[in-house]
From Swiss-Prot:
Residues 8-243, 249-496 form the ABC transporter domain. It catalyses: D-ribose(out) + ATP + H2O = D-ribose(in) + ADP + phosphate + H(+). Residues 499-522 have a biased composition (Basic and acidic residues). The gene is rbsA1. CDD domains: ABC_Carb_Monos_I, ABC_Carb_Monos_II. Coiled coil: none annotated. PROSITE patterns: ABC_TRANSPORTER_1, ABC_TRANSPORTER_2, RBSA. This is Ribose import ATP-binding protein RbsA 1. Belongs to the ABC transporter superfamily. Ribose importer (TC 3.A.1.2.1) family. SMART domains: AAA. InterPro entries: AAA+_ATPase, ABC_carbohydrate_import_ATPase, ABC_transporter-like_ATP-bd, ABC_transporter-like_CS, P-loop_NTPase. SUPFAM superfamilies: P-loop containing nucleoside triphosphate hydrolases. Part of the ABC transporter complex RbsABC involved in ribose import. Responsible for energy coupling to the transport system. GO terms for molecular function: ABC-type D-ribose transporter activity; ATP binding; ATP hydrolysis activity. It comes from Streptomyces avermitilis (strain ATCC 31267 / DSM 46492 / JCM 5070 / NBRC 14893 / NCIMB 12804 / NRRL 8165 / MA-4680).
C-alpha cells in the first residue's frame, strides 16, 4: 500500500500527568479504507491517545502526521478541520435539540442571515439515509434509543467530511442485532475510503470487522498484528503474559445451603422460582433477555417486591421487600448498572467502600473514620484497585477498578451470599480474570455466589451449576461437566419448568435436553 493511502501517523507520542506516564512512545498509523483496532486493558492509554487526536490533550513529545504533513492539534476545531471525528461512549449530543440541529450544531446552513431549516433538515435526512437509520431529522434526541443515538453521532461525523473516524467501544451497550447493523455501516464507510480507529473489548469483533490491530500496554505500543491473529495471542499481548485458562475456576467442596429460594413468584414477571446456593459454590444463571433473571435476584435482595414464596439465608427466613433485612442476613448485590446503582460516582474510593458498613461503624452518632479508612485501605489493597489514593473519585477509575470497588464494599460487610449481575460487562480481559480470581477467593472463604451473565462462556467457565431461566421460570439445571452452549440455549428457548431435587446434593442431570441451538455469546 502506497504512502498516498496513509491518512494518519503517530510517532513516539508521549504524555505525562503528575506522577503518571500515560503514554510512553506510542506508534500508530491508519490507512484509507481500513478498520484499525486499538486494543488494550483499561488504563493502558487508549483514552489518552484518543483525547490527543480529538484536541482535548496536547502531547509532551512525538509527532502527529495527517496525510504526510506534521500537524498540531490544539483543540476540537483543529481536529475537525483535519477531518478527524471522534464518537465517545458517552455521546456528545444535546437532548432537547432535534436530530438535524445536533448534526449541524454550530454549522447550521444559513440563507439571508437566518438558519435555513429546510436545507438543514434535507441534508440531515441524506446523512441519516447514508447510515441506514430511519429517524426524522425533526425528532428530539431525547426520544431516541442508544442505537439510534449512535447512528446520529456517525451522521454528524460524516457531515464534517471526516476522513478519520474514531469509535470508542461502540458496541458496549448494543444488542447483537444492533451490533450487526453497526458493522454493516462501518464496512460501508470502509468501502467509501474512510479510515476507522475501532476500540473494543470484544475479541470476537476483531476478526469480524478489523484489518489490523495495534495493542497498547502500560502506555506503550507493544505490537501491531493482523486482525486474524488468534485470541490467545491478542490476550498475551494485552496483559503481558499467557493466560492458560481464561476462566480459572477453583472448585472447593461445597457446604450447607446458604441461600434457599422457594416458590418465589411475582405475578406477571416470574413464577415458582426455587433453587439453592451452597457455601463455596458458584451458581450461574443463564437465559435470554427478558427471561426474568435480574428481576428474581432483585427480589431476593429485597429491592423489588414478590407476591409468594420465601427467601432464607442459613435457614433463617428473610423478610420480603426489605433491603436492610437482606443485608443484615448477609446478602449482597453487585447490580448490572454499576455506575447508576452500585457507586456514588462523585464520591471517593474510601467513601464508596464504606457505603455498606457506615451504620456498623457509627457509635453514639459518630463515625469511626479511622477504622473505616483502615478497612478501606486493606480491601483496596487486597483487590488490587489501581488508584492514585483512597481520595480519588470513582468516576475517574477504569471500569474494572470501579467493579472491584463495588465488590469491595460487600467484602467489608462480611457478606455470606453475593449476587453478581453481569459482573464483567464492559471491562477488559485482564480485569475480567482478576474478578474471576476474586470469585475464587470468596468461595474458598465459604461464601455462596449467584452469578447472572449474558456471556455464556463466562457462565460455563465459572459456574459449578447453571440454572437456565426462560419466560420467568427456571427451565432446567445443568452441572458443570455437562453444561454447554448448546444445552444451555436449548433450555433458554424451551417452555419447560424445572423443579429442583431436594436431596443434599443437587442432581446435575436434571433439566437435560437433546435439543441443539448454538448461540452467539455476546
Amino acid at each position: 500500500m502506497s504512502n498516498a493511502d496513509e491518512l494518519l501517523r503517530i510517532e513516539g507520542i508521549r504524555k505525562t500527568f503528575p506522577g503518571v506516564v500515560a503514554l510512553d512512545g506510542v506508534d500508530f498509523d491508519l490507512r484509507r479504507g481500513e478498520v484499525h483496532v486499538l486494543l488494550g486493558e483499561n488504563g493502558a492509554g487508549k483514552s489518552t491517545l484518543i483525547k490527543m487526536l480529538s484536541g482535548a490533550y496536547r502531547p509532551d513529545g512525538g509527532r502527529v502526521l495527517v496525510e504526510g504533513e506534521e500537524v498540531r492539534i490544539h483543540g476540537a476545531q483543529d481536529s475537525e478541520a483535519l477531518g478527524i471525528a471522534t464518537i465517545y461512549q458517552e455521546f456528545n449530543l444535546v437532548p432537547d435539540l432535534t436530530v438535524a440541529e445536533n448534526i449541524f450544531l454550530g454549522r447550521q446552513p444559513r440563507r439571508l442571515g437566518l438558519i435555513d431549516r429546510k436545507k438543514m433538515e434535507a441534508d440531515a435526512a441524506e446523512l441519516l439515509a447514508r447510515v441506514g437509520v430511519q429517524v426524522s431529522p425533526r425528532a428530539r434526541v431525547r426520544e431516541l434509543g442508544i442505537a439510534r443515538l449512535q447512528m446520529v453521532e456517525i451522521a454528524k461525523a460524516l457531515s464534517l467530511n471526516a476522513r478519520v473516524l474514531i469509535m470508542d467501544e461502540p458496541t458496549a451497550v448494543l444488542t447483537s442485532e444492533e451490533v450487526e447493523k453497526l458493522f454493516a455501516i462501518v464496512r460501508q464507510l470502509r468501502e467509501d475510503g474512510v479510515g476507522i480507529v475501532f476500540i473494543t473489548h470484544h475479541l470476537e469483533e476483531i476478526a469480524a470487522l478489523g484489518d489490523r490491530v495495534t495493542v497498547i500496554r502500560d502506555g506503550k505500543s507493544v505490537g501491531q498484528v493482523p486482525a486474524s491473529t488468534s485470541e490467545d495471542e491478542l490476550v498475551r499481548l494485552m496483559v503481558g503474559r499467557s493466560i492458560e485458562q481464561q476462566y480459572p475456576r477453583e472448585r472447593p467442596d461445597s457446604g450447607a445451603a446458604l441461600l434457599s429460594v422457594e416458590g418465589l413468584t411475582r405475578d406477571g414477571v416470574f413464577h415458582d422460582v426455587s433453587f439453592e446456593v451452597r457455601a463455596g459454590e458458584v451458581v450461574g444463571v443463564a437465559g435470554l433477555v427478558g427471561a426474568g433473571r435480574t428481576e428474581v435476584v432483585r427480589a431476593v435482595f429485597g429491592a423489588d417486591p414478590y407476591d409468594r414464596g420465601s427467601v432464607q439465608v442459613a435457614g433463617a427466613r428473610v423478610p420480603r421487600h426489605d433491603v436492610s433485612a437482606a443485608m443484615s442476613a448477609g446478602i449482597g448485590l453487585v447490580p448490572e448498572d454499576r455506575k447508576g446503582q452500585g457507586l456514588v460516582l462523585d464520591a471517593s474510593v474510601e467513601e464508596n467502600l464504606g457505603l455498606v458498613t457506615m451504620r456498623a461503624a457509627t457509635r453514639g452518632g459518630l463515625v469511626d473514620l479511622k477504622g473505616q479508612r483502615d478497612a478501606a485501605a486493606r480491601v483496596a489493597g487486597q483487590l488490587g484497585v489501581r488508584m492514585a489514593g483512597l481520595g480519588q473519585h470513582v468516576r475517574t477509575l477504569s471500569g474494572g477498578n470501579q467493579q472491584k470497588v463495588v465488590i469491595g464494599k460487600w467484602l467489608l460487610a462480611d457478606t455470606k451470599v453475593l449476587i453478581l449481575d453481569e459482573p464483567t460487562r464492559g471491562i477488559d480481559v485482564g480485569a475480567k480474570v482478576e474478578i474471576y480470581q476474586l470469585i475464587n477467593e470468596l468461595t474458598a472463604a465459604g461464601a455462596a455466589v449467584l452469578m447472572i451473565s449474558s456471556d455464556l462462556p463466562e457462565v460455563l467457565g465459572m459456574s459449578d451449576r447453571v440454572l437456565v431461566m426462560a419466560q420467568g421460570r427456571i427451565a432446567g439445571e445443568l452441572g458443570a461437566d455437562e453444561a454447554t452452549q448448546d444445552s444451555v440455549m436449548a433450555l433458554a428457548v424451551s417452555t419447560n419448568q424445572y423443579k429442583p431435587d431436594k436431596s443434599d446434593k443437587p442432581d446435575a442431570s436434571a433439566g437435560k435436553t437433546d435439543q441443539k441451538e448454538a448461540p452467539r455469546g455476546h
